[in-house]
A protein has these predicted regions:
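Catalytic cores of nucleotide-sugar-dependent glycosyltransferases that transfer UDP/GDP/TDP-activated
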Residues: 1-190
Length: 190
């Protein structure tokens, strides 16, 4: 989808219908950029003359779909104001921080939110034992349930540590790897 802003402005610039179409590109993870060899342009039905050093679609000698989207979209957003600030730095920008600085007036972080009428621990049907902030005791039953599903023994006074995430560098797993020996000394279940 990152190519749509470019395609609308280039492939379909002859069609007046698209004059009124504005595009917004949302960055969920700047590490997923869609980088391909320049030969990909033909397969994507893009003009070959769009690709040159420092062009709006080129990064380090490759076609970069995300850069194309960032350069041609009318607006850019991401999942939070904090993430928006982070990815404008060389540490987290994955090579596209310069593009984001160039488009800074069209770039916003919009905070993700949770609908607490759905994701509510005392109403959520996906949680076996409902609980509230006033009564956390059913959390022990949920812990027993989860451990039984994973074949682990239940220890009421031992913390259970888990994470739901993609195993990518941006999630900070290098920090866990660096300290795994110390972490394993704790009396915890993983």
């Amino acid at each position: 989808t990152a190519l749509l802003p470019l395609m609308i402005k280039d492939n379909y610039n002859w069609d007046r219908f698209y004059d009124r179409v504005a595009t917004v590109i949302s960055i969920h993870n700047i590490g997923y950029q869609g980088r391909f060899p320049k030969e990909t342009l033909g397969k994507a039905e893009l003009r070959k003359d769009l690709f040159f050093d420092n062009s709006p679609i080129e990064v380090w000698g490759s076609v970069c779909f995300l850069k194309a989207g960032l350069m041609y979209a009318d607006a850019i957003n991401t999942v939070s104001p904090t993430y928006a600030m982070e990815i404008t730095t060389s540490e987290y920008g994955e090579g596209l921080e310069g593009v984001l600085h160039y488009r800074i007036n069209d770039f916003w972080g919009i905070l993700n939110g949770v609908d607490y009428s759905v994701w509510n621990t005392d109403k959520d049907e996906l949680i076996p034992y409902a609980y509230t902030k006033e009564d956390l005791s059913p959390k022990y039953e949920n812990k027993k349930y989860l451990l039984s599903k994973t074949g682990q023994p239940y220890h009421p006074n031992v913390p259970l540590i888990g994470i739901i995430s993609r195993l990518v560098s941006q999630k900070g797993f290098d920090l866990i790897a660096d300290s795994i020996n110390d972490l394993m000394k704790f009396n915890a279940q993983w």
